[in-house]
């Protein structure tokens, strides 16, 4: 009898360690937490940062034709103060303005300065041609100590027109220029406001002065306003510079009788460029396409948290210092306490295998030849193909060429400047929200996709095995026939033929099912066995007492 019991127990143990195949997914000991649309702090196996925070503290010019204007202001390249003599004509795809740069020598200002600056930043440089103006009966060599070369001089691209002699009358004049080129000409002229009426009379004669400028799209008259002003560069007078873009074949006509600063050459834009205001040094050994006042951002990420005022091919500025994009599946580190046989994990969706390093999804098996682990490349590749390129798609959605508007505005332009700054701040808020939403949506899709591929793989195996195996609720299938390594490989690569093993599986299932108990039934039997044992011990004790009393070996006295 004892021998039969031992044999039965041995059979059960051998069968319990029978052939088995389990499905699982990759896991790591320490994952990365990301946010989705519905949850925050979900741990995933892999994640990629989408916000760039690293900055190169130099303007990277490798592969570019930079122009460092130094002490020359960008607008000065149009009119030619002494500090801009070497930049009257230039070609560039990266224009760097410095804090020390100055547009003028004789005090004054440009109208619509910021708009003109933006045009020049994207100009690709400028070249010029003579407007062909000739004069008689007046002087064209006006000079000032404020614009010094070897001595007193003036703007290289402008003519300061004066009466033929002090206090002499200035004749009425008309000069015209037709744009012969196929692209717009940038025309700049000036109106001189003398430091006093006496000075104006000395320079241009007595009487009221009027300057009129006309083209097919532009008509404007100007009257100088002589008067005392604080001295700048030793001058109390001022020159206001005005400008227009003259269309091809269009003609601009100047009519004047004094106080007119005449253009000598028309400027033409060469192509396209980027312009940046910065005081950091240049570095020709490094390349980049995103620039700001503090240097260069070299990044392939869709967002950056370095500077909101940038130019070039720029990642969108967001306020968040980090937005992690999930590029791997949900991670639940392997818990040894939940292991079944040979490391099978209870709940294959809820737990992972840390050893599965060559794929996202895979198999572990046990058979007479031993144990093994293998990745499932088909399901892994299916998931990776859909997730690869997420970063590129985000970049496509977010990157665009930006222009920098970051200058001091004149009083008249201040309201426009306030609107620009308010708009910039509002756009930053909107894009910070959009960025978080975009990343959360992509993360939700990645996690759902990874879980879906796991379910597809599980269903694929279940449909192959059919009645030849039984699910055990832990992501494993207990196989009712002998399954060697070749058999296991056929399950993995979806070539398993269940009819080949049907008879053997049916026979083994009949032998195993009668003694197979679920964990719930085991608990019931355990308690039943405990109760039966107690009852048996009590019955034996009562029987012994009864025999002893009957034989006179024990006496029971009942007292009332």
Swiss-Prot record:
Intervals, Extracellular compartment: 19-523
Signal peptide: 1-18
SUPFAM superfamilies noted in UniProt: Influenza hemagglutinin (stalk), Viral protein domain
Assigned GO CC terms: host cell plasma membrane; membrane; viral envelope; virion membrane
An example molecular function term from Gene Ontology annotations: host cell surface receptor binding
Pfam families: Hemagglutinin
Transmembrane segments: 524-544
PTM comment text: Palmitoylated.
Residues bearing attached sugar chains per UniProt: 30, 46, 249, 421, 493
Annotated localization: Virion membrane; Host apical cell membrane
Function: Binds to sialic acid-containing receptors on the cell surface, bringing about the attachment of the virus particle to the cell. This attachment induces virion internalization of about two third of the virus particles through clathrin-dependent endocytosis and about one third through a clathrin- and caveolin-independent pathway. Plays a major role in the determination of host range restriction and virulence. Class I viral fusion protein.
Annotated protein name in UniProt: Hemagglutinin
Gene name as annotated: HA
